Amino acid sequence: MKKALIIGGGGFIGSNITQFLLENRDYNVDVIDNFSRSASGKTPLLEKYRESDRLKIFNADLTKIENFDQLDRDYDYVFMLAAMVGVDKVNAVPHEVIRVNSMLLLNSLEWLRASSCGRVVFSSTSETYAGTIEAFGYDVPTNETVPLTVEDVSHPRFTYAITKMLGESGFINYARQGYFEAVVVRYHNVYGPNMGFRHVIPHLVERFQKNESPFLIYGHDQTRAFNYIDDAVLGTVLAVEKGTNQEIYHIGDSDEISIETLTCFVGKLLNYDGDYEYAPTFPGSVSRRCPDITKAKNDLVYSPSVKWQEGVTSTINWYLEYLKGAETSQESFYDQYGIKQ
């Protein structure tokens, strides 16, 4: 039986990958995370499988390299997903984003170099090339050969992207030395149930629940291609199983929509009948983002199947049910994600 390790398996994407492997692959799965995403220290998806003899869960701070010692050294597949992420984090504590993400990367690379693992997938982001689109007008949809650009190295917004650029280079160049095989996946606006609160779709739910009127649409003409979690998970697993060593793959969807279209769709689902008004978005937010996924389709046979309308509806329904349950539970929705009301 093959063995998989998910570094950062307590997060949104990591916990869904864990579920996929346990239900769709004959793998033993180890998960290691500091579980900081949840104030309770628990991840509902993982709790479902806690009694499985194919799953082991480790709670550890991997900025301390000695905490890798509790792991095996011979995994067939390693998913490196751990990172400090979020617009709130890069704006509030950019120095911590740099410190934590850099240490996670370097500790993981050094542990892998001393181990005998097979293939590694490193999770990157479309943020790595966001500056290129704005500064140089590269084509949208955008493929993997786009140069990576940081418009202002001093701006806190780019700290996350800079650490992901470091990770892409680090994993590819360690793989080039023969320590392991590595592929990189760049995620593009992954969303779905239980994604947390600091994302555009659950944030829209919260705002509509407050009956804001007029409802402000921030960056109404900006466009994104949203990638449902089930498709992102499958793309990631296919990348580590089938991807070419030292290659980068864009994992996303090619259906580009405007923020206005998304907002009005969510409003309709939530029976909003008030007015809308346009408002400026956050500084540094790119005007368009949509991946060219031709390479992933050809190499991985990756084909996202969940249309955005279907995925958004499923996500909204999940949040409505969760919020309804949180009203009577001791731990509120906000408490779970450590959010100050």
Stretches found by the model and what they are:
Residues 7, 98-102, 160-161, 194, ...:
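Short, solvent-exposed loop/helix junctions and linker helices
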Residues 37, 63, 97, 192, ...:
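Glycine-/small-residue-rich active-site loops that bind phosphorylated ligands and cofactors
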Residues 12, 85, 195, 257-258, ...:
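Short alpha-helical
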Residues 40-43, 91, 197-198, 229-230, ...:
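Conserved strand-to-helix beginnings and helix N-cap segments that scaffold or border functional pockets
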Residues 17, 209-341:
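C-terminal substrate-binding subdomain of Rossmann-fold SDR/epimerase-dehydratase oxidoreductases
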Residues 47, 69, 109, 172, ...:
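Solvent-exposed, non-membrane alpha-helical residues enriched in polar/charged side chains
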Residues 133-144, 165, 169-240, 254-256, ...:
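NAD(P)-dependent short-chain dehydrogenase/reductase
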Residues 1-190, 306, 322, 332, ...:
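N-terminal Rossmann-like NAD(P)+-binding domain of SDR-like oxidoreductases, especially those catalyzing
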